[in-house]
Amino acid sequence: MAQNPLSKPTACLVLADGTVFYGTGFGATGQTVAELCFNTAMTGYQEIMTDPSYAGQIVTFTFPHIGNVGVTPEDDETTDPVAAGMVVKWDPTAASNWRAAEELKGWLARRGRIAIGGVDTRRLTRAIRQQGAPHVALAHDPEGKFDLAALIAAARGFAGLEGMDLAKDVTCAQSYRWDEMRWAWPEGYARQEAPKHKVVAIDYGAKRNILRCLASSGCDVTVLPATATAAEVLAHAPDGVFLSNGPGDPAATGEYAVPMIREILDTTSLPVFGICLGHQMLALALGGRTVKMNHGHHGANHPVKDLETGKVEITSMNHGFAVDAQSLPEGVVETHRSLFDGSNCGIRMSERPVFSVQYHPEASPGPQDSFYLFERFAAAMDAQKAEV
């Protein structure tokens, strides 16, 4: 079923079931195929598009006004956009923000990302919920010429994210040190001066703001590629190990990540902290399992309950897989749970400073309710040193 309210659309989004959404194209021209998700955040579209966790996905923004504050290099979560494409309600207006360095349209075009505006995003979001993150093809042609049969075939031919190890595509090529802290007015980004803890961060697709939060918590951060071995991690003599966010199927990434994590847990007593994909990697290493969600959690307004304190945190989330809490073995405690659907959002080992959360405590975009987790990681390293 096609929806074509325009006399000459220049872009179209084609779902695998044959549904077509027409609109106005912007950004790069061409076509791409991916899994379709929706994000409910009102701000932070630049951080979302550059979040490595969105590899292999086209993002539908439910908030209608996207692009009105432009983009600035300071807000990139990685060097280039990683999300495969963008779907918005309204065609972006001119940027109005003192920090804006570039218009969204030009930024997307320069970075090779396709976008479509003028789409009924409420109807599309309903389709995503009903179909469960459908496979889609997105095309942008200034002449408005589309081969719908070929686009439907392309959408149906997309393999999907299950079984895909995308961390290898977005991880760093070699190790590096990170010392930039969180943005603060009026200084901007400052460099740390006297870090207390040596931390090795495994980069499955790490956001820059996660690394900044670690640095702001007193961590001297060395980032290693996703395929780093336990020996390579321990060669840096860390006080703690951090497992980052990232894209794809955790079971696929776990083929090489889980053995490394298990060796760290079996041979050391180091504190370990994981976020998002890192949370899933830790759960797999401890004997749990992960499952594909219907349409995932993507937004900056997700309520999560801390099961140990009873407090509710409003969190930022971006994941299409979840840890099956029923699969967690003895000695692993579920600590956080989504108040939207009851899915697992946090675990810890009962006798060791090893913990992780499914959501993003660094936010960017989103609320700052959960920054205490970085401080908890630093406190665990302090306590570990005091015992030596």
UniProtKB/Swiss-Prot annotation:
Coiled coil spans: none
EC number: 6.3.5.5
Source organism superkingdom: Bacteria
Active site residues per record: 276, 360, 362
Protein name in the entry: Carbamoyl phosphate synthase small chain
Family: Belongs to the CarA family.
Molecular-function annotations in GO: ATP binding; carbamoyl-phosphate synthase (glutamine-hydrolyzing) activity; glutaminase activity
HAMAP family referenced in this protein's UniProt entry, alphabetically: CPSase_S_chain
InterPro entries according to UniProt: Anth_synth/Amidotransfase, CarbamoylP_synth_ssu, CarbamoylP_synth_ssu_N, CarbP_synth_ssu_N_sf, Class_I_gatase-like, CPSase_GATase1, GATASE
Keyword Metal-binding in annotation: no
Physiological role: Small subunit of the glutamine-dependent carbamoyl phosphate synthetase (CPSase). CPSase catalyzes the formation of carbamoyl phosphate from the ammonia moiety of glutamine, carbonate, and phosphate donated by ATP, constituting the first step of 2 biosynthetic pathways, one leading to arginine and/or urea and the other to pyrimidine nucleotides. The small subunit (glutamine amidotransferase) binds and cleaves glutamine to supply the large subunit with the substrate ammonia.
